[in-house]
């Protein structure tokens, strides 16, 4: 398998859109978490993981998935406001905690300056019993490869 640079699937650029701002004209706080999930999904896709094999959808019965990955903790820090038209870079730093959990650390940058951070902890559970279980092979590989040379 060809060695790839994790930056290929762990960095995303985006532009702030009007619908993502509040009445004061700045990005609504919840948008950071939406951007985190979008960045994570795009990262998995760029790595080669088929999203419908990881996330439940109307096309797949949840019981057909081997694991579910609910969020059990999240937090965000906002250092500067963002406005419509701002271009930002989102960097994702995944870290495996143990055999059943991992955290996604995100850094938001504008013109090279850090303007926000988030961390989101996921736990792997059996979707039927809701008991903790081991992370899937796909997620384990993504976590391992994401930690190399970044």
Swiss-Prot record:
Pathway: Cofactor biosynthesis; phylloquinone biosynthesis; Quinol/quinone metabolism; 1,4-dihydroxy-2-naphthoate biosynthesis; 1,4-dihydroxy-2-naphthoate from chorismate: step 7/7. SUPFAM superfamilies: Thioesterase/thiol ester dehydrase-isomerase (SSF54637). GO terms for molecular function: 1,4-dihydroxy-2-naphthoyl-CoA thioesterase activity. It catalyses: 1,4-dihydroxy-2-naphthoyl-CoA + H2O = 1,4-dihydroxy-2-naphthoate + CoA + H(+). It is an enzyme of class 3 (hydrolase). Pfam families: 4HBT_2 (PF13279). GO terms for biological process: phylloquinone biosynthetic process. Its EC number is 3.1.2.28. InterPro entries: DHNA_CoA_hydrolase, HotDog_dom_sf. The active site is at 22. Keywords: Hydrolase. Belongs to the 4-hydroxybenzoyl-CoA thioesterase family. DHNA-CoA hydrolase subfamily. HAMAP family: DHNA_CoA_hydrolase. Catalyzes the hydrolysis of 1,4-dihydroxy-2-naphthoyl-CoA (DHNA-CoA) to 1,4-dihydroxy-2-naphthoate (DHNA), a reaction involved in phylloquinone (vitamin K1) biosynthesis. This is 1,4-dihydroxy-2-naphthoyl-CoA hydrolase. It comes from Prochlorococcus marinus (strain NATL1A).
């Amino acid at each position: 398998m060809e060695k790839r640079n994790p930056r290929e699937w762990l960095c995303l650029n985006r532009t702030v859109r009007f619908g993502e701002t509040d009445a004061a004209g700045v990005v609504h706080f919840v948008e950071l978490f939406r951007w985190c999930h979008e960045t994570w999904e795009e990262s998995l896709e760029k790595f080669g993981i088929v999203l419908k094999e990881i996330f439940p959808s109307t096309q797949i019965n949840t019981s057909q998935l081997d694991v579910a990955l609910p969020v059990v903790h999240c937090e965000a820090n906002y250092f500067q406001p963002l406005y419509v038209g701002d271009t930002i870079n989102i960097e994702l730093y995944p870290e495996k905690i143990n055999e059943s959990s991992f955290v996604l650390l995100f850094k938001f940058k504008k013109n090279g300056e850090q303007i926000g951070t988030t961390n989101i902890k996921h736990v792997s559970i059996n979707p039927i019993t809701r008991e903790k279980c081991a992370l899937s092979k796909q997620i384990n590989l993504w976590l391992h490869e994401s930690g190399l040379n970044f």
